[in-house]
Amino acid sequence: MTVKTFRGSPALSEFRLTQLQQKCQQYQLPITSVYAEYLHFVEQKTSLVEDEIVKLQALLHYGSMFSELKPAGYCLIVTPRVGTISSWSSKATDIAHNCGLSKVNRIERGIAYYFNIERDLTEAELATLKDLLHDRMLETVLNHETEAALLFTQQEPKALTTIDILNGGRQALERANIALGLALADDEMDYLVESFTALKRNPQDVELYMFAQANSEHCRHKIFNADWIIDGKKQDKSLFKMIKNTFEQTPDFVLSAYKDNAAVMEGSKVGRWFPDPDGQYRVHQEDAHILMKVETHNHPTAISPFPGAATGSGGEIRDEGATGRGAKPKAGLTGFSVSNLVIPNFEQPWENPLSKPNRIASALDIMIDAPLGSAAFNNEFGRPALLGYFRTYEEKVNSFAGKEVRGYHKPIMLAGGIGNIRGEQVQKGEIPIGAKLIVLGGAAMNIGLGGGAASSMDSGKSKEDLDFASVQRENPEMERRCQEVIDRCWQLGEENPILFIHDVGAGGLSNAMPELVHDGRRGGKFDLRSILCDEKGMSPLEIWCNESQERYVLAVAPENLELFTALCERERAPFAVIGEATQAEHLILHDSHFDNNPIDLPMNVLLGKTPKMTREVLSKTVENQSLKTEGIQLKEAFHRVLRLPVVAEKTFLITIGDRSVTGMVARDQMVGPWQIPVSDVAVTTASLDSYHGEAMAMGERSPVALLNFSASARLAVAEAITNIAGTHIGEMKRIKLSANWMSAAGHTGEDAGLYEAVKAVGEELCPALGLTIPVGKDSMSMKTTWIDNGEQKSVTAPLSLVISAFARVEDVRKTLTPQLRTDKGLSSLLLIDLGEGHNRLGATALAQVYKQLGDKPADVVKVQRLKDFYNAMQTLVAEDKLLAYHDRSDGGLITTLAEMAFAGHCGVEVDISALGDNDLAVLFNEELGAVIQVADSQLESVREVLKAHNLLGITHQLGTVTADDRFEISRGSHKLFSEKRSELRSIWAELTYQMQRLRDNPECAEQEFEAKKNPDDKGLSAFLTYDVNEDITAPFINKGVKPTIAILREQGVNSHYEMAAAFDRAGFNAIDVHMSDLMIGRRNLAEFNAMVACGGFSYGDVLGAGGGWAKSILFNPKLHEQFSQFFINPNTLTLGVCNGCQMISNLAEIIPGTENWPHFVRNKSERFEARVSLVKINEVDSVWFAGMAGSHMPIAVSHGEGQVKFKSVEQFAGLKAQGIIAAQYIDNNGSPTELYPANPNGSAEGITAITNLDGRVAIMMPHPERVFRAVSNSWHPENWTEDGAWMRLFRNARMVF
């Protein structure tokens, strides 16, 4: 094979080049200018002929939006790490093959950097420059393009290694333990020596590696299952038994706990929406039970933040999909705890930057890259991210031996979510003897080795090269393909071919396959060389144990293999049958290449008889001083608190994540017309036709554990309850919790503290409240150690419990938000003080910003009061008695009130006289409680409800809401604090601005920051020129044959369900059509009246968003003809939305009347943008927008490449002259705009929807299908009932037929 190089488009925008040059200057490198462009390296099986080269060059021409320069100067080429295959490569190669380029073996991409230099670089300068250009965990720097052949080097398969314990004894195993990074404990090594001596043979490296992964703390939770002796006294229960006690006390509504990849609870009976085997989407009335899971991915995120967090989210999504016999992930949550950010030029008074080991990323780098990784995976998979938390902590505090640093050098990266599952699919099936054992998903690669064992070690205990080996690689588009297969399977009901399914996570197949057959009470016989592999030189250990992502293991009965194969082929999801289930509980892995058995073990050696841990520990107490508040000024204190990340505005973490996909999001983080990120709870509808739903909320108060372990745990549970209380759930037993425990096991005092905290929750608080914890996770190695200039250093995380609460929702429309209302007449603000006046300041945000800890933290004062509070809120919510609700948490009462005022774009006047004598304690304590806004006309009835629940005595009337721009706090007649709300809002927004300035286009960051300062911003609004509640298709109901529409999707598309639902509601028969159906002739576009190309990430947006999809049509003669005929047929309609818009714009050459259409390129911000944007509908001659001209209304936006790009000024002028610009982004005053974020992508004159000349073909970047129901709009006017404003677009299409 030979490698050919093709130049690509410029890789970096001007501001990215400027940033790079500034970094070079910062390190005093002699560089005067820099330019970067993509290089494509194509490995050919045989030489391409001229027309194939032309086709390939067209394929590799994409995304050219920056100025192209002639490459010149000193060159360095950054490529994916040699020996790995990037996900970009996998998808680009797929596109080439689907375009008929069968001679292409693989395509890889690099970036060539060209530097003008004043003199030759020294070796040290060159090393610095390379560090600036690449991530050593993921990338390689080449000196010349001829070295690109290294990217395609294939080696001969490596052989097994045998560890000679029969002759070398335990010492041989100890050497292997260190060399392979197995993290085996002493008793485990004794066990292995004993086991293999009894088998009379030496172990192979793969067997030891498999054992280490399968029995790591990460996978087997040995500490939570251990026996405990504390202060010399044997404890009755393990940690896990105390957690299980919550289920034993309150099993109500739980369908599955502790035995599967996720827990399941009862959901609502609704009309679930999916296609039947004939391809037509239909409603299926059935229970949509709720599954829940929350994972952590801390170690990989510390080592390489983007892929670490991405694969964290991906692994949790797989856990959900692999529940029962297959389930559907629905909505996600994310959380991060890191040390202090220390943002350049934004350093804060409480931040004293400490050093860190080189092998881990800084807190700032983690919070720039990790949220992008997590969001990117969720976005591309098609799961909305609706909830999260973000905490920073790093401080020297008192310890049992002087001072020590507590913080999150080893971060917490939390990924979780909910999904739905059919009742009959909740329990896994039996695995019959002879069942086919299958790996579904991508090929094995030599990455992510040892993740389970590495995650189980304190950061610093493993070798850096082992950290390097445990980095993983994400390919969410592949996971989407696999999920589509799983969906097709469970949608078959009783005919579901999946009997048993697990995801492949830590330990790779070495953990997943033994777990699969063990759980099915079987053994397995496997063929190593049947496993799909992208790297032929891998050893048996590397093939069996690597953690290549996006894979599942399944058991399928032999008679159903043909059906399963057909489903995979349609979705283009790779799979391999690698073995069969056996009656004997024995594991055999045969290697046909070397004709040996790398594994030949009884299952009980691997999983059955491993030693049980006993932990003998001492409890410790630390003396702490009370908070010193002398000299602290209220104004300065509040400004500091508003800048503390746990309190500050977190828009930079939210708008990078899709929050509208599925069309079932009823409450995301952004609240009200001003889209302020202060929601307490995330809410989804259970289906596309129901008001039943699901809710998620979180609770986390980890700094409190530095003062009181059990109080921290109780507060986490209680805060999750006060967060979720503002939606309509019913009895508290309906709420189920996930508990994620992070601890530095073995650190003095932490083990006993962990036991105390688990007992407080599992044995006491949750049983008293009737709460169940059916799922959770532990991470027991939260300590970082390193040597700095010969000095031993360490940073230890506080005991951290993150509680995620999940519940069925009776009516999603009743969900309250913190938005204060000024349009509801006179109203009052009430504080329900569950802290009962204790006003403790220990471990608060106030303490943190003054580099203190304090001594007494908040706690649950009375458990019954918490229950009464929840029940009272449920009554008030159900009866629509409240206008706004917000719990008191980080930052205290003053923050609660400020966030409510920000959301309402209004002022408040409150008097704190009744709350205590100490102003700082009253305003900044973080005791449990909530502020409610009540219309004065409802005040008496609300008081009656509070009285009935014994809360009136702890309820205090604070003051009123005002329509002006003042935030005022008084004590009687004395004004304590008075400031413009808009100025406080600006301070609160500084963190987001600073992070966006570093991460995104600084010009966009500046524009958004300025927009937030505007006290006169009108917020979102809607003006419709038609009646939103009129169904213009009503005369067609039940009359005649419905027109059919092809709901067209390609691999990676994710918005087809809601699109089909919108067209079905408008009166179409919606048919699921995959591009593979058209390619092989299962379907033909001639069958359909209309076609819609749906949104998502076809081919992961590789080769330009929508570009690969379009080129697979243009370069396929059969598809080219089929699409051409459809477009010229005057009796058809076509719609393209988001990715479908991008794709159809690339088909302009075969669509009549599109000669002036633009292409769509990367957003000006260079960031995926998920926003609610205002658009104006123009007067165009198009059936799609009939009767809508002059309207302006909100719409969901979710894209990374939505900026229009014209070939010339003349083309742009031609488009305007033709009058086919259907919609434009407008600002909150109604004027078309190019300012960010009202215009989320920077398109000229706000262009966002276009038609062809005769109006039959329309393309648009925003998502009307996600907001066709009023309830799925983040904000909408109250006179909208069931239908959203965009339902008219779909009904307009129906009027044609």
UniProtKB/Swiss-Prot annotation:
Domain Glutamine amidotransferase type-1: 1045-1297
Coiled-coil residue windows: none
Source species, domain of life: Bacteria
Chain segments carrying region Disordered: 303-329
Keywords linked to the UniProt accession: ATP-binding, Cytoplasm, Glutamine amidotransferase, Ligase, Magnesium, Metal-binding, Nucleotide-binding, Purine biosynthesis
InterPro entries per the UniProt record, alphabetical: Class_I_gatase-like (IPR029062), FGAR-AT_N (IPR040707), FGAR-AT_PurM_N-like (IPR055181), PurL_large (IPR010073), PurL_linker (IPR041609), PurM-like_C_dom (IPR010918), PurM-like_C_sf (IPR036676), PurM-like_N_sf (IPR036921)
GO BP: any one term: 'de novo' IMP biosynthetic process
GO CC, alphabetical: cytoplasm
Listed pathway(s): Purine metabolism; IMP biosynthesis via de novo pathway; 5-amino-1-(5-phospho-D-ribosyl)imidazole from N(2)-formyl-N(1)-(5-phospho-D-ribosyl)glycinamide: step 1/2
GO MF annotations in UniProt: ATP binding; metal ion binding; phosphoribosylformylglycinamidine synthase activity
List of residues binding Mg(2+): D680, E719, N723, D887
Enzyme class (EC, first level): ligase
Record SUPFAM superfamilies: Class I glutamine amidotransferase-like, FGAM synthase PurL, linker domain, PurM C-terminal domain-like, PurM N-terminal domain-like, PurS-like
Stored SMART domains: GATase_5
Record-linked Gene3D superfamilies: 3.40.50.880, Phosphoribosylformylglycinamidine synthase, linker domain, PurM-like C-terminal domain, PurM-like, N-terminal domain
PROSITE patterns: GATASE_TYPE_1
Subcellular location: Cytoplasm
Pfam families per UniProt: AIRS_C, FGAR-AT_linker, FGAR-AT_N, FGAR-AT_PurM_N-like, GATase_5
Record EC number: 6.3.5.3
Family the UniProt entry places it in: In the N-terminal section; belongs to the FGAMS family.
Quaternary context: Monomer.
UniProt-listed PANTHER family: PHOSPHORIBOSYLFORMYLGLYCINAMIDINE SYNTHASE (PTHR10099:SF1)
HAMAP family tied to this protein: PurL_1
Protein name as catalogued: Phosphoribosylformylglycinamidine synthase
UniProt source species: Haemophilus influenzae (strain 86-028NP)
Originating gene: purL
